[in-house]
Amino acid sequence: MSSLRTDNDTWDIASSVGATAVMVAAARAAETERPEPLIDDPYAKILVAGAGNGAWQYIADDGFVAKVTESDPEIGPLFEHMKNYQAVRTHFFDAFFAAAVDAGIRQIVILASGLDSRAFRLPWPAGTTVFEIDQPLVLAYKSSTLASHGVQPTADRREVPIDLRQDWPTALTHAGFDADQPTAWLAEGLLMYLPADAQDRLFAQITELSAPGSRVAAESMGIHAQDRRERMRERFASITAQFDVEPMDITELTYEDPDRADVAQWLTAHGWRAEAVPSQDEMRRLHRLVEIADGDDQSFSTFTTAVKR
């Protein structure tokens, strides 16, 4: 059970789960500026810059990482791993959407979209509708920030400002969603913030709303042993104290329920053809795997994709 979460908690872009979206956007911004990037997200930097001051400022700051590494030599590879992971994850799910539209799907739903800019940066075919579901304040920040820079969506983008713990299927339908049309669903950076029963309920709702031929993609986090979690917590606490950085412990926001269902197995049992790709395999394939202390196969996440039968 997460110690910082409550059943009806809310957040904006600078607090709680919302702040993690800024950290992910910072990693995408850093990747975009690499010589040979895996992704191109020209809007990530804009979204990070408008979010104010926070721990996310240091994710892509090579100078800061170098200073921290002098104090803790294992931190450098860990920060590099974190940035590489976000790049590989984004690349994987970009490819998922490309395959979906190539198959003729024109209805997209991004769950807990955060600062995801795919509705603005991907080359969607004519007639594509992208629904984004998230907390009202998060969606409002993204829309207003990008609009102030003259950024326009490349699809028919529709906001669904609602918490996924509420009746989001009704809100989605009111926004124009058509359950008779095949849909491509994405749950990226989401499941770890849901209790096990809420995850099952989410996929049951997706299944009910999905016409045959629909597709779903999801990221599920690996298992982190309690002692490893404690070591990481102590390490980052030391960094924040030593370098006067605003503390942010993501593990306090997530749920590591031991009885959480395996996503691919759940989908297979409920009418989907599912495939699971260990994230370390994808990182290795793209030459982005960084060896880190305390790393093992169980600690890596899994990328699952499925097609509705």
Curated annotation (Swiss-Prot):
GO MF annotation terms: methyltransferase activity
Keywords carried by this UniProt record: Methyltransferase, S-adenosyl-L-methionine, Transferase
EC number(s) on file: 2.1.1.-
GO biological process, one term: methylation
InterPro entries: Ppm1/Ppm2/Tcmp, SAM-dependent_MTases_sf, SAM_mthyl_Trfase_ML2640-like
Residues annotated as binding S-adenosyl-L-methionine: 134, 163-164
Superkingdom to which the source organism belongs: Bacteria
SUPFAM superfamilies tied to this protein: S-adenosyl-L-methionine-dependent methyltransferases
Main function: Exhibits S-adenosyl-L-methionine-dependent methyltransferase activity.
Family, per entry: Belongs to the UPF0677 family.
Entry-linked NCBIfam families: mthyl_TIGR00027
Protein name: Putative S-adenosyl-L-methionine-dependent methyltransferase Mvan_0104
